[in-house]
């Protein structure tokens, strides 16, 4: 188990600065969305072999794993031009990620927040995009990791299993598991049962966990929280992690420097028998 962070939570930095900053903050791994993380890379069009080599060597020097090359694309969008750009960019990212030595290329399956009807309409387009992306993943031998989100076409366990079965290549199609993005009804969900069901079904293809916590205000508006201070219950996830013998990346999203050290301690506790429940002590 390695503890990491979404790099652009620290804002955009110079290429030579980011890895040292993450090392100093005691992280071991990172998720990199290059245009969001680095000055001098305004878009994917600005990625060059020279910049990739700068990033690779700086992270290697600081012993920071690039757990996820983030290329979050609108894969389910019915608009042909939008989807063509999404798939083409995802394919390019396979080569870029390979050059960086990244563990996986990560993506969700949509940009907007979709209602149920639209999620169903977008699913065939999502599936087509994933299949086309997988062709490149296999060609360059760079795993693609898909991230389910309840308001996207990849909305639930059943859809996720359907995609995994249709692709049928566990070596190249992996998963990022963000439990908070699957908690549609925090007030009524039995999280222990829910996360156990997910992990029993697809745990073997999960390489990365996104770790965050939140509360809902009186207007039901999402509010990021320190780990253990919100509605998330990580007990079942902790039990699963304790059994894993392979490397799993735990990446903090929505990092806040006010309680970043406490959050790192919380994440470290998830992998051991000392985890005492959902709330921090």
Where are the model-predicted features located?
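A short acidic, helix-capping loop that chelates divalent metal ions and anchors anionic groups
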Residues: 37-42, 75-80, 113-118, 183-186, ...
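A short, acidic, flexible beta-alpha connecting loop/helix-capping segment that sits on the rim
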Residues: 10, 249-266
């Amino acid at each position: 188990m390695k503890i990491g962070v979404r790099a652009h939570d620290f804002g955009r930095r110079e290429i030579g600065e980011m890895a040292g900053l993450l090392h100093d903050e005691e992280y071991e791994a990172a998720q990199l969305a290059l245009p969001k993380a680095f000055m001098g890379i305004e878009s994917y069009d600005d990625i060059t072999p020279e910049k990739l080599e700068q990033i690779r060597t700086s992270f290697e020097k600081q012993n920071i794993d690039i757990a996820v090359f983030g290329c979050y694309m609108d894969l389910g969008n019915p608009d042909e031009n939008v989807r063509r750009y999404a798939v083409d960019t995802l394919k390019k990212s396979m080569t870029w990620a390979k050059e960086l030595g990244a563990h996986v290329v990560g993506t969700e399956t949509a940009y907007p927040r979709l209602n149920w009807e639209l999620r169903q309409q977008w699913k065939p387009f999502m599936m087509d995009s994933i299949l086309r992306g997988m062709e490149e993943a296999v060609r360059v031998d760079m795993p693609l990791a898909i991230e389910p989100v309840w308001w996207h076409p990849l909305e639930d366990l059943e859809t996720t299993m359907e995609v995994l079965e249709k692709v049928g290549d566990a070596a190249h199609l992996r998963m990022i598991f963000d439990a908070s993005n699957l908690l549609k009804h925090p007030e009524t969900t039995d999280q222990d049962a829910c996360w156990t069901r997910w992990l029993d079904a697809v745990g073997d293809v999960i390489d990365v966990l996104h770790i965050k916590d939140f509360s809902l205000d009186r207007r039901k508006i999402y509010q990021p929280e320190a780990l253990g201070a919100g509605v998330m219950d990580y007990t079942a996830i902790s039990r699963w992690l304790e059994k894993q013998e392979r490397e799993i990346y735990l990446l903090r999203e929505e990092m806040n420097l006010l309680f970043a050290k406490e959050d790192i301690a919380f994440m470290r506790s998830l992998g051991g028998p000392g985890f005492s429940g959902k709330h921090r002590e």
